[in-house]
Design a protein with these regions (language model features):
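Acidic/glycine-rich C-terminal interaction modules and beta/coil loop segments
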Residues: 1-86
């Protein structure tokens, strides 16, 4: 899988959503998931499973937020402090 247990996912709410890249989607019912962004067409959000294959569709009125994932970091590369915080 692209994202393994214990790895860190970095989300950027200001980044553009790019087709074929990963996003975090939170629904108004409280569920959140990470999927591959396909696009939004006719008020319907299209996503693919991270593992590929299965396709998901959500009406945009069900969606609370869509956030671009800008990095996936293995535990060995994780830094507790932000590198630009000093």
């Amino acid at each position: 899988p692209a994202i393994r247990n214990g790895w860190y996912v970095v989300c950027d709410p200001d980044a553009d959503l790019v087709p074929n890249e990963f996003v975090q989607v939170c629904l108004k019912d409280g569920r959140c998931t990470i999927k591959e962004f396909v696009g939004i067409n006719g008020g319907v959000l299209s996503l693919l499973s991270v593992n590929g294959g299965e396709r998901f569709f959500f009406e945009m009125d069900e969606v609370e937020s869509i956030t671009a994932i800008t990095d996936i970091v293995p535990p060995s590369q994780h830094r507790q402090e932000h590198p630009y915080s000093h």
